[in-house]
Every structure is written in C-alpha cells, then in structure tokens.
Regions:
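Extracellular/periplasmic carbohydrate-active domains that bind, remodel
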Residues: 1-177
C-alpha cells in the first residue's frame, strides 16, 4: 500500500491493521473507479445527550424530513445536530439567519438536494459527517461569518455535487477533508 501499511491477502480478502486514524482508498489492480473507501475516524469524544435542550439527535436508522416536499431539516440557533453512527438522513440541513449551530457525529446524509445550505448565519460547524450523492453542492454557504468544516467526507456520481461552494463568507476554516 502507498501509505506503507502492511497487509495480507487470503481467499480474496485483504487484512490489515491501523495504528492511527486515516482516510484510505483501496484500489484492486489499479482500478481507481471501483475502489473501496475506508475511513478510520478517531473515537468520538463528544456524544450529546439526546434529551438535552438544543440537541437534535439522529439515532441509528433512516430519517426523512417531515416538511413538504420532504427534503429539508431547518435548524434553529444554538443547536447541536448529532448524527449517530448508523444514522442515515435523507434530506438537506438548512440554516438561515441563525448562529451557533454544530453538525457532529459519524452518520450519513444520503441523496439530499444539498447536504448543507447555510445563509446569513454565524458560527456554523460541521465535523465528522459523510454526504453521499447530493444533487448539488455538498455545502452551500452564502454570507456566513465563522464557518468551520472538519473531517467532512463527500461522494457523488452527479455533476457539481461533491464540492463546497461559498459566496461572500468570512472567517472560514476547512481542514481534513
């Protein structure tokens, strides 16, 4: 492996051990199109109590928005949105004219219009979430002051859909994507 990770192959299976977190692409016979992505995240250190006020908790399982047409969760100020490991959310998250909102966890956003849509807001954070097959941008930001994106994973087979599009934003920090 290019990262120097030792591995063995037995009966069409690859075995390896990791001693630290990392993001890996496993490519068989140099096939970069049909690869396997492995995300070895650090253990979660912050799991909010689902009963705490200001917490929107998505437990393991499938979740759809209840809005019409059923494609968006609108988030209020001073909220922590937690996607637990095994949580699959089928919809985008909207923050408009809000502040102090965090999206954390190891869950997935699957097939949304966009993963995240932030406008006219302050102090927004994304950490650890994976977005799969959005129809458009993974993160769309407009006039956001204080946006932190860390350990975001995004995949899509659709055009213009796996990126971060920011317009008139300031104090933006993007790392480990």
């Amino acid at each position: 492996l290019s990262k120097g990770i030792e591995y063995t192959v037995r009966e069409n299976m690859i075995y390896f051990s990791l001693d630290k977190p990392g993001k890996f692409s496993i490519e068989i016979n140099e096939n970069r199109v049909n690869n396997l992505h492995v995300f070895a995240n650090e253990p979660e250190t912050e799991v909010p109590n689902p009963d705490d006020p200001g917490v929107v908790y998505f437990a393991p399982g499938f979740h759809r928005p209840k809005d019409l047409p059923g494609n968006a969760f609108t988030i209020s100020s001073n909220t922590t949105v937690y996607l637990a490991p095994g949580a699959v959310v089928n919809g985008k998250f909207i923050c408009n004219n809000v502040e102090n909102v965090r999206f954390i966890g190891r869950g997935y956003i699957d097939n949304p219009v966009r993963g995240f849509e932030f406008t006219h807001s302050k102090n927004i954070e994304i950490n650890g979430i994976t977005v799969i097959n959005p129809d458009h941008y993974t993160v769309l930001g407009g006039e956001v002051d204080g946006l932190k994106i860390n350990n975001l994973k995004a995949f899509s087979c659709k055009g213009w859909s796996d990126g971060i599009d920011l317009m008139s934003c300031k104090n933006v920090e993007i790392k480990d994507i």
